Regions:
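Acidic, metal-coordinating helix/loop segments flanking the phosphotransfer/catalytic sites
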Residues: 34-51
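A short, hydrophobic beta-strand element within the central beta-sheet of small alpha/beta folds
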Residues: 75-85
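Receiver (REC) domain active-site loop signature in two-component systems and cognate sites
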Residues: 58
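Conserved phosphotransfer cores of two-component systems
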Residues: 45-48, 69-76, 96
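Two-component/phosphorelay signaling modules centered on CheY-like receiver
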Residues: 15-33
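Active-site residues of response regulator receiver
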Residues: 12, 55, 82
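Non-catalytic signal-transmission and effector/linker regions of two-component phosphorelay proteins
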Residues: 1-9
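Acidic catalytic/metal-coordinating carboxylates
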Residues: 37, 62-65, 70, 89
């Protein structure tokens, strides 16, 4: 929590996606942090973040490796955004 409000970190390489999610979530009263890629998400990760929303397909560090690194230090839930729908992608998401 940050300033008494739930805090959500959104990592997506598409600015439009980040902006839409940020506006929707801030409108519901959440504090929203954003990151352009997995590397930035890892750098922004903190105990005050209550939920991570990570795009699976990002340059530099993609969502799955970013989630694994974040998970080493923090226990907040992680939601993945993806256009992928294969069984292996679903399994990978649950294994992080």
């Amino acid at each position: 929590m940050k300033n008494g409000k739930y805090c959500i970190l959104i990592a997506d390489d598409e600015k439009e996606i980040r902006d839409i999610l940020r506006l929707l979530l801030e409108g519901e009263g959440y504090v929203v942090l954003t990151a352009e890629d997995g590397r930035e998400a890892i750098a922004e990760a903190a105990a005050e973040v209550d939920l991570y929303i990570l795009d699976v397909n990002m340059p530099e560090v993609s969502g799955f490796p970013a989630a694994a690194e974040i998970r080493k230090h923090f226990d907040a839930p992680i939601v993945f955004l993806t256009a992928y729908s294969t069984e292996s992608d679903k399994v990978m998401g649950f294994s992080v």
